[in-house]
Amino acid sequence: METAKGSFSLEVMDPDNISGWRDEDPYFGSEKRGKNIILYDWFAMTSKIDSVESLIDKIGFTSDVKFEDTYGFYGYKNRVMFDGMSIHYNHNQKSADYPLIEFTGQGCRDFETYTDGNWWRLFEMALDTENYHVTRLDVAFDDHDGIFDIRNMVMKTLNREYVSKTHKAQIVDSITREVDSWSLQFGVRQSDMYCRVYDKARERGYTDGRHWIRCETVFKDEYALNFIRNKLSLGEKYCGILKNYLRFVEPNKSDSNKRRWKTSKFWDKFLGNCNKVKLYTPKTVDYNLSLSLIHI
């Protein structure tokens, strides 16, 4: 485990040494009790060159893991699955039938538990864009220290006391007989990046009063690839991306421009003075094509 340097008020799991963390219990392991962490929480990638067997081999299991056949998904006819890890495939070899490796949140914990936990083994495959295409990467910050007050964040969102790159925010109020809980979403699911904040303890049904709020960001396609390409530490780039994407602010009645309002203290405590990180890559212009069109 690596403690974030500088102003970061959180602990970051070192992607090369995180074996043993299990997501279903945030208090698993005395050395991790009550720690704020950043972790990978979803990974999906297609391959042009692999079979199911070669993908399983490349995952690099260090203990016996048995994949079981199950029903297909996402238009694939077949799938093998172990806990939260799946490989979707078709028997016929068409260009659109490239096998898809997918880890859910639990699948990411399985990867860290049943291999040496080295995410860069998979990320180096993703960087080979001729043969692989990363379709989704989720990165989550788990707050166990009380940095986030979900009710306060809901109220600030309702009052539009935030500045964001996205034009859409959504508040979901889930009411059951025992509890009610809120979740926030900034951006839409169809976009290449969106952010969710929710009460993970309530979602898991814990009733012992523990504080576990998750801030989860979903990256797709080019955004996922650019996240992997960025050479900053996991904590620096995740916090930097959020700093560029979303900011909660304190209202100032004498200034109508929200962008000049001060950042809320809890958001500053979360992100500190990290530098903003942008994932968007402007499309380059093919000048040869442009010139040829001019002469048509």
Regions found by a protein language model. Give the residues of each.
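Catalytic cores of extracellular degradative/oxidative enzymes
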Residues: 290
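Conserved small/polar residues in nucleotide/adenosyl-binding loops
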Residues: 294-296
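Structured, helix-rich domain cores that form ligand/interaction pockets
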Residues: 1-287
